[in-house]
Amino acid sequence: MFKTLTQNLTKIFDKLVSSGILTEAQIDAAMRDIRVALLESDVALPVIKDFIAEVKQKALGQEVIKSVSPGQMIIKIIHEEMINLLASSESETKLNLNSKPPVNFLMVGLQGSGKTTASSKLALRLKNQNKKVLLVSLDTYRPAAQEQLAILANSVQINSLPIVQGEKPLDIVKRAIAEAKISAYGVVIYDTAGRTQIDKEMMEEALAIKKIVEPTETLLVIDSMTGQDAVVTANSFNEKLEISGLILSRIDGDSKGGAALSVKYITKKPIKFLSSGEKLTDLEEFDAERLASRILDMGDIISFVEKAASIVDREEAEKTAAKLKKGKFDLNDYLQQMRSIKKMGGFGSILSMLPGSGKIMDQIDQSKLNSKIIEHQEAIILSMTLKERENPDIINASRRKRIAAGAGTTVQKVNILLKQYKQISEMMKKASKMNPKNLLRNGIGKLFS
């Protein structure tokens, strides 16, 4: 989501670091460049103004001007201020589950914000924490909205309140309250109706629901793709409903990222979760330091390790590592890596969590290693014999023609796969010889140099 902002800030940081001793004029110029980068990313103007003022005040301090590496000191200040911009106390960011059961959560937001998906993701997260969860759809306006929630709930074996056609939202709430008591649910998540825009009727209905439900949390789902409109939306909901926290959806989208940097600062309400993709497991607890590090191209190694640990088969990973140490990496290993990459959201998603990735993200985009390409490559590799997978060098022109026919593709696509395999094979072998500390310190850009 922050690709453009990350790349623009990386260029500014490179200038600062390469300058050696910094003058006040150079710091002023850097602040102007940062201001432009934030404006282009749809960060709200009041946020930019206060952020730049804080950074500049600290950057002009004597300890920075006289430091051995003033450029690095300013980058450190920017990192700290970005954390301050995004952060809330730990007690605020954690989901409040301390009420007497059933604990009620009210999900609000505009239509199309990803609210229903976020409700289901939250339900799955709580189910995995051994909570008995009931999902309740109050959206009687959007066609098939109630059915959508029921399908999502059923896909992960979570109960949803049975649908009664023609029932009004407030009547659904009363039925849900009774069901929660009878069946001893620990958590009830109410998915309210959205609108294409904020209106008086929508807010009055949501307020009436809130009075009956008495939720422990009122969570506003904000679409990160909406830019500065997200701030207006967040303010309106907060004024009328007094929200307790925010969930930012579609953070994996190709948006400018300004919403994430603005909504918390403007509303003074904590960001609790980041939602990405359609998979119900794609919900992560918000961590200001991790996100700030990702935006500033310092990486988010903790998220990377957590995600990898939940997906990668440890035994297979150890086998691959042992082979790499011996300088071996065949097409079976390549296929295994591609499948893991696909599960983790694609190559771009992985790289965005590693330090130094900002400088090579365009290069990675051009490689087009998305999920569909990986599926096509999987079909090509599975059309090869075991001997060909273990010894790619034997794949001559006639073998390539046979493989292409077996995979239902062209020889050109087979050639592209073999070329990418060779490049990644060299990169993997290079990485296996590097000191892990140096790899993290220097960033993954070194692998491509």
Curated annotation (Swiss-Prot):
Residues noted as binding GTP in the record, renumbered to the chain: 109-116, 191-195, 249-252
Disulfide bridge positions per record: none
GO biological process, one term: SRP-dependent cotranslational protein targeting to membrane
Localisation: Cytoplasm
SMART domains: AAA, SRP54, SRP54_N
Reactions catalysed, as given in the entry: GTP + H2O = GDP + phosphate + H(+)
Entry's Gene Ontology molecular function annotations: 7S RNA binding; ATP hydrolysis activity; GTP binding; GTPase activity
Pfam families linked to this entry: SRP54, SRP54_N, SRP_SPB
CDD domains given in the database record: SRP_G
UniProt main location, coarse: cytoplasm
Entries under InterPro entries matching the protein: AAA+_ATPase (IPR003593), P-loop_NTPase (IPR027417), Signal_recog_part_SRP54_M_sf (IPR036891), Signal_recog_particl_SRP54_hlx (IPR013822), Signal_recog_particle_SRP54_M (IPR004125), SRP (IPR004780), SRP54 (IPR022941), SRP54_GTPase_dom (IPR000897)
Enzyme Commission number: 3.6.5.4
Keywords assigned: Cytoplasm, GTP-binding, Hydrolase, Nucleotide-binding, Ribonucleoprotein, RNA-binding, Signal recognition particle
A GO cellular component annotation in the UniProt record: signal recognition particle
Known partners and oligomeric status: Part of the signal recognition particle protein translocation system, which is composed of SRP and FtsY. SRP is a ribonucleoprotein composed of Ffh and a 4.5S RNA molecule.
Family: Belongs to the GTP-binding SRP family. SRP54 subfamily.
Domain remarks in the Swiss-Prot or TrEMBL record: Composed of three domains: the N-terminal N domain, which is responsible for interactions with the ribosome, the central G domain, which binds GTP, and the C-terminal M domain, which binds the RNA and the signal sequence of the RNC.
Function (record text): Involved in targeting and insertion of nascent membrane proteins into the cytoplasmic membrane. Binds to the hydrophobic signal sequence of the ribosome-nascent chain (RNC) as it emerges from the ribosomes. The SRP-RNC complex is then targeted to the cytoplasmic membrane where it interacts with the SRP receptor FtsY. Interaction with FtsY leads to the transfer of the RNC complex to the Sec translocase for insertion into the membrane, the hydrolysis of GTP by both Ffh and FtsY, and the dissociation of the SRP-FtsY complex into the individual components.
Protein name: Signal recognition particle protein
Organism: Rickettsia felis (strain ATCC VR-1525 / URRWXCal2)
